[in-house]
């Protein structure tokens, strides 16, 4: 008995309609190429096999209305519909919603849940909400949070909302995002900001590491002391003025006050002491969000920390 060959597509030419202007090429292809694994899509993007208007593009290229996307022949696996996600995960994320309207969802993302699947993660927040909201055909992440960071995460249900919020985020002063972080040592009250350029490196393993480097992109984070635990630790508010990868984590380390529970940029001795108090997580939480909506209203939200965070701070205070 022979195994039937996987179906192969021919060259595909895809026109970009006005309502998809601003969408990243990878998300466009994931939505259009049903049955194509994400690994295949990212591979053809990296190799430059996808062309837009007959030219090569980067994997993070944002489409313009009227673009023509050329996709090379692909061998696709025979695939059934995605397996239903665990009911417990669906219920947990439904309960995490702090705001929802016709075009936007905001959740208080738990620590430990990735925003999207891939790299060994079967499903993340976006896959969950595509299953929870099957009628929202254009559902996309507005921005990202690291897997181990908790807090407010925006998900657009309409392309128009996604474009509006991306424009607002690029405006720097228009969207106000504030994080809480538990850091090592005594953060000086006079240290109001950290400005240091950040350079992103992709390791062979696929892991991303960021370092302060003069060749990096300008990055600014404002800090404010919220609470002290002697000279051992400080709870700070961090407001990233720029939006670089791992910005708050690297700026805190650069200032000499690493965030508790940070496996990449943290202080292992400090993190171990916090773990002994029951704090087995990264102590970085997107606590507050202020964002303009298309109708001129301003959405202001706050998200509480989880019980593990609360208990750890109570024990620190004893």
From Swiss-Prot:
<dbReference type="GO" id="GO:0000455">
    <property type="term" value="P:enzyme-directed rRNA pseudouridine synthesis"/>
</dbReference>
<comment type="similarity">
    <text>Belongs to the pseudouridine synthase RluA family.</text>
</comment>
<feature type="active site">
    <location>
        <position position="146"/>
    </location>
</feature>
<dbReference type="GO" id="GO:0160141">
    <property type="term" value="F:23S rRNA pseudouridine(955/2504/2580) synthase activity"/>
</dbReference>
<dbReference type="InterPro" id="IPR020103">
    <property type="entry name" value="PsdUridine_synth_cat_dom_sf"/>
</dbReference>
<dbReference type="Pfam" id="PF00849">
    <property type="entry name" value="PseudoU_synth_2"/>
</dbReference>
<dbReference type="InterPro" id="IPR006225">
    <property type="entry name" value="PsdUridine_synth_RluC/D"/>
</dbReference>
<dbReference type="InterPro" id="IPR006224">
    <property type="entry name" value="PsdUridine_synth_RluA-like_CS"/>
</dbReference>
<dbReference type="GO" id="GO:0009982">
    <property type="term" value="F:pseudouridine synthase activity"/>
</dbReference>
<keyword id="KW-0413">Isomerase</keyword>
<feature type="domain" description="S4 RNA-binding">
    <location>
        <begin position="23"/>
        <end position="83"/>
    </location>
</feature>
<dbReference type="InterPro" id="IPR050188">
    <property type="entry name" value="RluA_PseudoU_synthase"/>
</dbReference>
<dbReference type="GO" id="GO:0003723">
    <property type="term" value="F:RNA binding"/>
</dbReference>
<comment type="function">
    <text>Responsible for synthesis of pseudouridine from uracil at positions 955, 2504 and 2580 in 23S ribosomal RNA.</text>
</comment>
<dbReference type="InterPro" id="IPR002942">
    <property type="entry name" value="S4_RNA-bd"/>
</dbReference>
<keyword id="KW-0694">RNA-binding</keyword>
<keyword id="KW-0698">rRNA processing</keyword>
<dbReference type="InterPro" id="IPR006145">
    <property type="entry name" value="PsdUridine_synth_RsuA/RluA"/>
</dbReference>
<protein>
    <recommendedName>
        <fullName>Ribosomal large subunit pseudouridine synthase C</fullName>
        <ecNumber>5.4.99.24</ecNumber>
    </recommendedName>
</protein>
<dbReference type="Pfam" id="PF01479">
    <property type="entry name" value="S4"/>
</dbReference>
<dbReference type="InterPro" id="IPR036986">
    <property type="entry name" value="S4_RNA-bd_sf"/>
</dbReference>
